[in-house]
Amino acid sequence: MKNKRNNEKYKVGKNLKGKEMEIDVAFFSGKERAESSDGVEALKTEKIIKPVNGISAVILAAGKGTRMKSDKTKVLHEVSGKPMLAHVIDACLEARVSDITVVAGANMQQLKSFAAARYNGKNIRFVLQKEQLGTADAVNSVIKAKIPLKDGVMILSGDTPLITADTVSYLIKMFTKKSDGGIIGVSFAENPAGYGRIVRNSEDYVMRIVEDKDADDREKTIKVINGGIYIIRKDSLERNLEKIKVNKAKGEYYLTDIAALMYAEGRPLIPVDVPYRELAGVNSRAQLAEAAKIRNKKVLEKLSENGITIVDFDTVYIEEGVEIGNETVIHPFTVIKSGVKIGKNCSIGPSAHLRQGAVIGNNCKIGNYVEVKNSTVGNNTNVAHLSYIGDSEIGSNVNIGAGTITANYDGVKKNKTVIGDGAYVGSNSVFVAPVKIGKNSVIGAGSVITDNVPDDSLAIARPRQETKTGWVKKRRKK
């Protein structure tokens, strides 16, 4: 019988009590199943699934990332405004996994500095993997360090920035309800070349994981691949890590070998389908860009579902952590960084750049080639063309003319510009901060404002125009 890939419930085999198990998303097909019915005698023995007393996360982040060609460690390169490792940690925290251990190598100090700045007060430990001896050795470093792990140990890679809290939660649910040994995240790939293949018995328990280079002709036809995310009972993990032998060709210990060991002892891994994209590891700058593109699309889709119009998904870039009000329109070639807040009924772009600290009120227009950074813009205010607003406080009902610049940096520190409610700023004006413009004041076009302007005042700060009638004709006669 063939089970087609679809979104229906799918029976993955009987558990130790003889009851059929299901996962929410089917991915197996008959032709991909390893043609083996060996089974394990221990599986036929009825056993009760032991309750799980909590989940610990172990995140592998010691890799050198040489293909990135960077002094910055690979897992700290950013996707959608935050480091890859932060995406993985945040997915765990959002899934209520607060006991987290990160395995580091030579990048230990970089990772500790990152965590101190971003997760101060969170229970995040670091363990050193002294030598790069493979994924099993990395996990064993945590065991040898006598970290007090909980009953379920979730193992993830720090370079998978597309992983979501929903997937982590789903895997934990499947582990606690279905497995007496462990589960492994897997996915279906039309082109599985380069990935480890999941070899299963007739009941869909994982018999072993075969790396692509080691797969025979039959195994190469398997399209169910290893996702590199596991949840394994602590006692089984500790016991089987000690049994993993070094790969003679590479001189490393592979965590994938644990699948065959767990199968042999009658506590096999259960395969659980996870979205293919979420498994993708980042090893190069090109893959980093691809991950950012995928993350960005998810951000835009979510905003669209909440009543925001994104005119062109291909050219708008919005990082995670941005708040945008209903009925706002984001035009093409606009970049909005994490932490920006935009009110309702606004028009942003095209080609606008909103950076950290920008807070835009309701019914505002931030138009062509406008950059706003660390500034508040009040309700019903227009900054329509070719302007830089930095370290500023702009009131409500203000009109900022084209080419306006807030000159905020004096060579030592950033200074603030304040423009009161109802002010009108003529085109090509420059505010040399610190400076304050009063309510309902008017700034003449082309002015360079260096002094404060009181409420209801007109300020003009430009050379007086001088016109010499007939000057051109006189010049020609010379």
Predicted regions and their residues:
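Conserved N-terminal catalytic core of the sugar/cofactor nucleotidyltransferase
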Residues: 2-4, 8-28, 38-56, 83-156, ...
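Short, high-confidence coil segments that cap the C-terminus of an alpha-helix
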Residues: 97, 150, 179-182, 267
